[in-house]
Structure formats: structure tokens, C-alpha cells
Amino acid sequence: MKTLLLTLVVVTIVCLDLGYTRTCLISPSSTPQTCPNGQDICFLKAQCDKFCSIRGPVIEQGCVATCPQFRSNYRSLLCCTTDNCNH
């Protein structure tokens, strides 16, 4: 009986996903994607280049381990730690 119980516990541990994985949007029109291990922060970055006045800001979204540093050509930068928060 103890062997059966121990076997069930081991199988349960092996089959379960023990680590929680974050999901973030990778592009404005994408469905949420699972982030790689260690990248638990979702981000949304809007930055301008020389064509910003014509086509608008360039949007970049995804998963990161640390929030990117804000730069002068960014219109906005959002870092968040809940699923799909970077929309």
C-alpha cells in the first residue's frame, strides 16, 4: 500500500507543471504566448523613429526577465507582472 501511494505521489509530481509560467502578448494582433522560463515580466514599448509622424509609433511587446530601461525615443514603456497585461 505504501509503495502504491508513493508511486502515485511521484507520478503526480512528474506530471504536474510545478512552475507557473507567465503569458504575454507578443505583438498587437497576436494571441497570448507562454513566456520562456525566467522571463516573468510582460512589456509594451512604443517608440518613435523618423517616420513616427507618418505611420505612428513602432509597438513592441513580449516577455523579459527585467524591465527595459526607458529611452528618450520611447513614447511609452509598460512593464507588468500579470498574464496578458501588456495590451
Swiss-Prot record:
Disulfide cross-links: 24-42, 35-63, 48-52, 67-79, 80-85
Effect of residue 55 to A: Loss of inhibition of neuronal and muscle receptors
Tissue-level expression: Expressed by the venom gland.
One Pfam family named in its UniProt record: Toxin_cobra-type
Keywords on record: Acetylcholine receptor inhibiting toxin, Disulfide bond, Ion channel impairing toxin, Neurotoxin, Postsynaptic neurotoxin, Secreted, Signal, Toxin
Outcome after substituting residue 57 to A: No important change in inhibition of muscle and neuronal receptors
InterPro entries (UniProt xref): Snake_3FTx, Snake_toxin-like_sf, Snake_toxin_con_site, Toxin_cobra-type
Domain of life: Eukaryota
Main location: secreted
Molecular-function GO terms, alphabetical: acetylcholine receptor inhibitor activity; ion channel regulator activity; toxin activity
Secretion signal span: 1-21
Subcellular location(s) per record: Secreted
SUPFAM superfamilies: Snake toxin-like
Known partners and oligomeric status: Homodimer and heterodimer; non-covalently linked.
Further comment: Shows very low activity towards muscle nicotinic acetylcholine receptors (IC=~10 uM).
Protein name: Kappa-bungarotoxin
The organism of origin for this protein: Bungarus multicinctus (Many-banded krait)
